[in-house]
Design a protein with these regions (language model features):
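N-terminal helix-turn-helix DNA-binding core of bacterial DNA-binding proteins
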Residues: 4-42, 64, 68-77
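Histidine-centered divalent metal-coordination motifs
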Residues: 18, 48-49
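Amphipathic alpha-helical dimerization/coiled-coil segments
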Residues: 2-5, 74-106
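Core alpha-helical elements of the protein kinase catalytic domain
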Residues: 23, 50-51
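Alpha-helical residues within the helix-turn-helix
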Residues: 37, 48, 54-55
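Residues in the helix-turn-helix
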Residues: 45
Length: 106
């Protein structure tokens, strides 16, 4: 995955509504109707934010009848965590040819 995909995922988390949606989904799948009521937002607002979360890969969805059902994409969230962690590590942790002084800094 490249920088553009990393940025896309990070940007998906820079909105209060999207963070609230992820928190609402952390205990399992929810119907769009449940999210509308729980978060007190409109249908167009939910659709907008879900599209961004789904495009970033953080949320999965499927349609049942007239309602969309949403859940956190565990695999993609783990990839996101790994990606964030990779930016926090020094190259010397994974590449023995890199010489640095990070071990002395903490």
């Amino acid at each position: 995955m490249g920088y553009r995909e990393d940025v896309k995922r990070m940007k998906a988390l820079t909105d209060e509504n999207r963070l609230a949606i992820l928190l609402a989904l952390q205990h399992g799948e929810k119907c769009g109707c449940e999210l509308l009521e729980e978060l007190n937002i409109t249908q167009p607002t939910l659709s907008h934010h879900m599209r961004i979360l789904a495009d970033s890969g953080l949320v999965a969805y499927y349609k049942e009848g007239k309602w969309m059902h949403y859940s956190i994409s565990a695999k993609d969230v783990q990839e996101f965590r790994d990606m964030v962690g990779s930016y926090a590590r020094c190259d010397c942790e994974t590449d023995s040819s890199v010489i640095c002084r990070c071990e002395n800094e903490s």
